Amino acid sequence: MDNSGKEAEAMALLAEAERKVKNSQSFFSGLFGGSSKIEEACEIYARAANMFKMAKNWSAAGNAFCQAAQLHLQLQSKHDAATCFVDAGNAFKKADPQEAINCLMRAIEIYTDMGRFTIAAKHHISIAEIYETELVDIEKAIAHYEQSADYYKGEESNSSANKCLLKVAGYAALLEQYQKAIDIYEQVGTNAMDSPLLKYSAKDYFFKAALCHFCIDMLNAKLAVQKYEELFPAFSDSRECKLMKKLLEAHEEQNVDSYTESVKEYDSISRLDQWLTTMLLRIKKTIQGDEEDLR
């Protein structure tokens, strides 16, 4: 069956679901189990939505899932309603990102009302990702990652909470909210130190915190590096700590060549990602005689 055939079938299912809803509101249905007709309508709306998905008509699929969700709410089937709102959100993602967010927020309201905070947290991440990639509103993405982290923390899912917080820190630093980023990197780094599995990553978090300090002020960065070495002696031997010390020295001497050379040397072994490149360029611009490139 081609897409137009699937769409025609979906439209027929929608009409059938609407008839069921209408019939459920009649006087006799009220006496003889109108709710079973509503249940049938829910099922038919979901079938129509899936048929629209097959036809790649994402908006129509989203709308049909929303209709099913509203009927589930009428029947007090909260869990089913939330599931349908999530399905609607996933369909709308492909056609109308803002509507996808609205549907996911409806699902989140239901899940939090039911005390299902882990699932609510997961959907806050989905919303954050839509703001990151589709709507490019980083402030709103940050807010949803923070909300997700809060819910995960409340449920003792600390590693999931930390993943969200690290996203917040990365974006906060790019938005020049350095203190916010520092607080998160230090908190996650300190927690990682105490875990045999995560210990190795602590140096990366302290390195990122030190770079944020450096963007505020060189003396800040110097004191931060000393603090991290005392707190986590393994940091002293890391390539990240050695790079920080070289960068501080180059900055103190206002030696842009030495700064660039140190970054190049580090990059030849550990490739710099976009975030590190941005931060290192910001610091480099504070050295006199700066050129625009790191390498």
Curated annotation (Swiss-Prot):
Database matches in CDD domains: SNAP
Intracellular or extracellular location(s): Cell membrane
GO molecular function, one term: syntaxin binding
Membrane topology annotation: Peripheral membrane protein
Keyword presence, Cell membrane: yes
Alphabetical keyword list: Acetylation, Cell membrane, ER-Golgi transport, Membrane, Phosphoprotein, Protein transport, Transport
Residues with the N-acetylmethionine modification: 1
Pfam families per record: SNAP (PF14938)
Cellular component annotations (GO), alphabetically ordered: cytosol; extracellular exosome; glutamatergic synapse; membrane; neuromuscular junction; postsynapse; presynaptic active zone membrane; synaptobrevin 2-SNAP-25-syntaxin-1a complex
Keyword match Protein transport: yes
Modification Phosphoserine occurs at: 26, 29, 195
Domain of life of the native organism: Eukaryota
GO biological process: apical protein localization; brain development; intra-Golgi vesicle-mediated transport; intracellular protein transport; membrane fusion; neuron differentiation; regulation of synaptic vesicle priming; SNARE complex disassembly
Subunit (UniProt): Interacts with PRKCABP, and disrupts the interaction between GRIA2 and PRKCABP, leading to the internalization of GRIA2. Found in a complex with VAMP8. Component of a SNARE-like complex that contains at least ZW10, USE1L, RINT1, STX18 and NAPA/SNAP-alpha. Interacts with VTI1A. Interacts with STX12. Interacts with GNA12 (via N-terminus); the interaction promotes CDH5 localization to plasma membrane.
Family membership: Belongs to the SNAP family.
Function of the protein: Required for vesicular transport between the endoplasmic reticulum and the Golgi apparatus. Together with GNA12 promotes CDH5 localization to plasma membrane.
Protein name: Alpha-soluble NSF attachment protein
